[in-house]
Amino acid sequence: MAFRNPMYQLSNVDDIDSEVLNSRFLSETKDDGFSRRRTTLAVCATKKDLYLYGTTPAGGAEWCSEVLERTRPRIAHKRQRRRHVPRWISDSFRTCLPSPSGKWKEQTANEGEGRVKSSWLAACDERIGIAEPTNYWHGIVRTEDDSSKTLYLIPETWEDVHLKEGFVAIIDLAAERLQCSKLILFVDKNLSALSYLVKSLHWVGFEPVPHLDCVDHVLFGMEL
């Protein structure tokens, strides 16, 4: 299934001027006849690095503002092919997501076999992706019955998850840009370092979320 939904690029930047740090702007640019919007979403400062989120166009990733491009001209634009959601991630979301009240039937074609598979998603669900330099997060933003929003996230690998710096920026993105009041992570139960990861998640502020239908993953949540 082609991943054609919003993707957020997390860039590790070590020298951004105050103009970028204070920016909350939206600019319109045209490329090949199409309008694209780029905006600075969230900046997280740590002792050594700055983590900057920016929207990216479908099919590729790029620095999120002209200001940043002028600040770091030596950084080349990074083009990527459109991502595909691995089947195990799709299955995890379909199995572990709470049943919404309003649903719609999503049909996805298997390009290799030409078959169509149907699954149920909430009509208000929004699929997103978060790209880090060494990892990629697949996510769903769900609007609950009380109009609050929850961000569900699952990484392609837990080996390169930066619990301190990366999660602070992800929490900032979820709360400030996506307007979510809760963040829930999917953690593979078969991880060799599961016990250490659980302790680290507790340290960051996550708590286990019971879910009887989730067989291969355990859920951890945080109120934002």
Swiss-Prot record:
Gene3D superfamilies: 3.40.630.60. GO terms for cellular component: cytoplasm; nucleus. GO terms for biological process: positive regulation of protein catabolic process; viral translational frameshifting. It holds the Pfam family ODC_AZ. GO terms for molecular function: ornithine decarboxylase inhibitor activity. Belongs to the ODC antizyme family. Ornithine decarboxylase (ODC) antizyme protein that negatively regulates ODC activity and intracellular polyamine biosynthesis in response to increased intracellular polyamine levels. Binds to ODC monomers, inhibiting the assembly of the functional ODC homodimer, and targets the monomers for ubiquitin-independent proteolytic destruction by the 26S proteasome. Interacts with ODC and thereby sterically blocks ODC homodimerization. PANTHER family: ORNITHINE DECARBOXYLASE ANTIZYME (PTHR10279:SF10). This is Ornithine decarboxylase antizyme. It comes from Schizosaccharomyces octosporus. The lineage of its organism: Eukaryota, Fungi, Dikarya, Ascomycota, Taphrinomycotina.
